[in-house]
């Protein structure tokens, strides 16, 4: 099918579903935003406004790297038979920086037929002393990068390819970000920015890669950091630079070895690097460089060995992605908690799928009976206990529905090392679902919580992680996208770090549950899972999501929201406000695993209508572990 036609059909389907769920006015509002972005917001949309760049130049006028007040950053760039057009555009992007704190270190391994590379560089050197150059023998990308590093005199290093373009404010922004980290008392050893892909001109970028803050599980699935990465030269020297045996994935290897030393990284949500897409570049996919995949798996296996963890590294669901199948430590028992009121057809489907499909054997199931009124329900419980060996049914003593209270009550009967909160209207799809949830938690350095991929019966995504701030409070990642897709930057097809996952299927270490006090019963219906995950995150633990645990969620796409019932609407509004009161509105609206340049109105990871942070050159940075 023609790609444009396919995309048009997908958008039409999304518009129809959005109209059903949230009404015509909402659909029209979002549609208008989409048209604005596509038709009127393309040119130079990721660059700061001209007046911002002029202000930066004015601030730095007459200053040198020594007295500009910014840390010096030496950019390492191996050259190899670089086309003149690409080389001049790259060199121009360096000399036209708004701040003088950069040094460009060029190691030229071009062959004799490309002597023009040296001539062009020397032409620039006569005008700009901040460019240093050495002709070298070609020993591969890592060794050539190491040769460039030998020329560096800066406190920090950065990596740049010879055919790409630096944003004009790259050195200024990274220098200011380092100073900001120091002022905040945070580690300043390793930073990275966002990037954009382009073909002909950075005035017309193709797409931006708006990245999350440091996400360790994501980094083990793909090198999402890429460009522009800046790190202390002392760290580079300590770890020995890049490893030639990792050519093809040498930067990924470097970043993993850096975070082994720093314990984390800082993210600057500004587009500071433009990655050229052309035949032979990795920005066009690893099909252009097949050796990358083999190198990446070696890099990941080496990282596991250095950090004392065990698992198998495999190809991921898509090219350029990978999967660590962690070895599960011991034989942890999982207590599955399922609240239920009547709805025995749903419950039977859920229980039958657990007992007939689950490959992990060490589990118990506790159904928490919550005020059922149909006598047939209790007959069903009696029959189910006979049919499903070890099934427990416990009676919640309170009246009304309080999801938090029901699960807190059920925990009293659980004997597992892990608790699994599970809705009664889900059905297991793959045999290893529980094993895969455990893989993310039951190993040294694992997450405390892991969520699953939940699909609607029509094979669209219901849940692929929770993003706080969407719609003002919280929303689901990639909701309504067709199953089997990669999502934004592979984020629907790789293990992810999130601030929260849905309580419809949530695995948590029992010790962590007890440490934070279980679910907050003031959140009776809404946001109890979000609040719980945020308290776990704030206690220093990670929350992961895996696409390798899949369940069908029979929650209706078109079910009425709480806002349609006045009583429920008041309760929902109160729980919304409590979420702000407990965690702070600013924290809810700024999810570290969701870039501020992405939309807050939709659940599709599309670009925001509001890119003022980019246009103003706003510098915000926070280190995360």
Predicted segments, located by residue:
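C-terminal, non-catalytic tails of nucleotide-sugar-dependent glycosyltransferases
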Residues: 2, 6, 10-68, 289-331, ...
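Short beta-strand-to-loop acidic/aromatic patch adjacent to the donor-nucleotide binding site
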Residues: 154-165, 416-429
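Conserved donor NDP-sugar-binding/catalytic core segment of glycosyltransferases
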Residues: 169-205, 426-473
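Short, acidic, metal-binding catalytic loop of nucleotide-sugar glycosyltransferases
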Residues: 92-101, 352-362
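A short, conserved alpha-helix in the catalytic core of glycosyltransferases
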Residues: 235, 245-271, 300, 433-438, ...
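Glycine-rich, basic loop-to-helix element that forms the pyrophosphate-binding segment
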Residues: 136-152, 396-414
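Active-site donor/metal-binding and catalytic loop motifs
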Residues: 269-286, 316-322, 455, 521, ...
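Nucleotide-sugar donor-binding/catalytic module of glycosyltransferases
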Residues: 35-288, 302
């Amino acid at each position: 099918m023609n790609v444009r036609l396919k995309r048009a059909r997908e958008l039409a389907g999304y518009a129809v579903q959005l109209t059903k769920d949230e009404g015509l006015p909402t659909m029209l509002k979002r549609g208008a935003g989409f048209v604005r972005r596509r038709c009127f917001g393309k040119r130079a949309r990721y660059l700061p406004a001209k007046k911002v760049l002029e202000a930066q130049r004015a601030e730095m006028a007459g200053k040198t790297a020594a007295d500009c007040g910014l840390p010096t950053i030496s950019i390492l760039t191996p050259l190899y038979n670089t086309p003149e057009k690409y080389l001049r555009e790259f060199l121009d992007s360096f000399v036209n920086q708004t701040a003088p704190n950069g040094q460009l270190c060029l190691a030229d391994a071009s062959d004799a037929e490309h002597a023009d590379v040296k001539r062009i560089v020397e032409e620039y050197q006569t005008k700009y002393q901040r460019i240093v150059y050495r002709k070298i023998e070609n020993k591969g990308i890592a060794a050539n990068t190491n040769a460039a590093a030998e020329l560096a005199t800066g406190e920090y290093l950065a990596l740049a390819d010879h055919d790409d373009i630096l944003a004009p404010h790259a050195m200024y922004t990274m220098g200011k970000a380092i100073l900001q980290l120091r002022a905040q008392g945070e580690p300043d050893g390793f930073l990275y920015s966002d990037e954009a892909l382009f073909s002909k001109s950075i005035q017309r970028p193709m797409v931006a890669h708006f990245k999350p803050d440091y996400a360790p599980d994501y980094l083990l699935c793909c090198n999402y950091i890429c460009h522009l990465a800046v790190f202390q030269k002392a760290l580079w020297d300590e770890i020995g630079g890049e490893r030639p045996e990792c050519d093809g994935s040498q930067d990924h290897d470097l970043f993993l070895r850096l975070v082994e030393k720093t314990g984390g990284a800082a993210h600057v949500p500004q587009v500071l690097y433009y990655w050229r897409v052309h035949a032979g570049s990795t920005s066009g996919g690893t099909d252009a460089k097949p050796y990358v995949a083999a190198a990446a798996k070696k890099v990941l296996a080496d990282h596991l060995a250095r950090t004392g963890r065990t698992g198998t590294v495999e190809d991921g669901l898509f090219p350029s992605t990978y999967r660590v199948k962690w070895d599960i430590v011991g034989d942890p028992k999982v207590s599955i908690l399922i609240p239920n009121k009547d709805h025995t057809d749903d419950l039977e489907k859920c229980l039958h799928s657990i007992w007939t499909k689950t490959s992990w054997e060490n589990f118990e199931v506790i159904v928490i009976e919550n005020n059922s009124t149909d006598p047939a329900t209790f007959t069903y419980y009696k029959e189910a206990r006979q049919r499903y060996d070890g099934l427990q049914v416990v009676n919640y003593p309170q009246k009304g529905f309080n999801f938090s209270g029901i699960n807190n009550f059920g925990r009293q009967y659980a004997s597992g090392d892990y608790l699994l909160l599970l809705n009664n209207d889900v059905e297991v799809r793959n045999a290893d679902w529980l094993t895969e949830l455990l893989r993310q938690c039951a190993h040294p350095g694992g997450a405390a919580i892991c969520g699953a991929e939940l699909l609607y019966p029509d094979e669209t995504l219901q849940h692929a992680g929770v993003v706080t701030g969407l719609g003002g409070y919280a929303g689901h990642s990639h909701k309504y996208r067709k199953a089997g897709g990669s999502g934004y930057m592979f984020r629907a097809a790789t293990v992810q770090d999130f601030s929260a996952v849905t309580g419809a299927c949530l695995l948590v270490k029992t010790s962590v549950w007890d440490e934070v006090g279980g679910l907050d019963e003031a959140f009776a219906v809404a946001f109890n899972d979000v609040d719980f995950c945020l308290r776990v995150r704030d206690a220093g633990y990670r929350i992961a999501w895996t696409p390798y645990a899949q369940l069908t969620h029979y929650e209706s796409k078109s079910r009425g929201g709480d806002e349609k019932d006045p009583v429920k609407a008041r309760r929902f509004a109160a729980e919304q406000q409590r979420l702000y009161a407990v965690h702070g509105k600013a924290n809810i609206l700024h999810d570290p695993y969701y870039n501020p340049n992405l939309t807050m109105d939709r659940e599709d990871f599309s670009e925001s209508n509001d890119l003022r942070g980019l246009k103003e050159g706003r510098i915000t940075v926070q280190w995360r572990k």
